[in-house]
């Protein structure tokens, strides 16, 4: 069966397809609406051929990937990182037809950059629920801050944490018997905050159910690590999907965007700021976990004690706590990798220096 190489330049309204045969000759170049029916009609004309696809990662990539991954004649799917394919990014003649041609040619001649990993459907679902939860937490926080501002204006003191639950709002409302107008406002805000809390609880339950379907053991291993909470563990699992795609701990740390950038020339090496690649939410949560470790008064094991000493040593030497906590977060990412790769719960005992470095 003949193999056809298809380069696709995807956009929201219309997309450009370029089909090449094994000799590199164009069989078809066409622009169609990015519509399921039109795409399927076009691909049906190649049902007697094996088709290899190449397209850039983006908002429409997931949609197109779901359309073609279940087709019987799909031979290969290569999702290209937009910034790493220099043939397109540095081209002086950039348009949809040229881009689709370069993608198809790169696929045929095998000079495309390493493909972008496409996560499983359950990981996408967990990630969507985590994004929804984060938005709801932000909404609840705004409500609590508004209530706190009103109460302070009335001379009623209370911490932000005290208003996080039903009892905290009830105590505040009981102090407003003489302020009927403001009492009604606080009652309304309390009802909204509690409503958001209920939504968050429901979302967390859905996340836990999805995690248990696919990552039950992995989740238990992750939450055994000090500083790793339910949300952090679920985020890690939704982002990495399969730890086997990382060969070394350094690769995982790099994926989290926690390694310093490097500029080397000859014998001169300069390390700059962290790369900040990968998923921002994962990096943020690991840094938050690192802060919690740094602030613990008593460390429960030897490994945490070393991390805490490292934090204070770097803070005093460089006078930069942000760099120090980022270093702890990077070490924490290596621990996460070690736990998932070895398929064992966290262990705080360090047998030797080599083991400490491999964690």
Each language-model region and where it sits:
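Gly/Thr-rich phosphate-binding beta-strand-loop-beta motif of the actin/hexokinase/Hsp70
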Residues: 2-21, 103
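Nucleic-acid-processing active sites and adjacent nucleic-acid-binding tracks
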Residues: 25-49
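Conserved DEDDh/DEDDy metal-dependent 3′-5′ exonuclease domain
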Residues: 41-88
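Short alpha-helix plus adjacent loop in nuclease-associated cores
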Residues: 79-115, 268-277
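A short, charged helix-loop
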Residues: 104-128, 168-180
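Glycine-rich, often acidic, oxyanion-interacting loops/wings at catalytic, nucleic-acid
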Residues: 131-221
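Phosphate-backbone recognition surface of nucleic-acid-processing proteins
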Residues: 221-224, 230, 236-317, 357
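Low-complexity, acidic/Ser/Thr- and charged residue-rich accessory regions of DNA metabolism proteins
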Residues: 267, 310-359
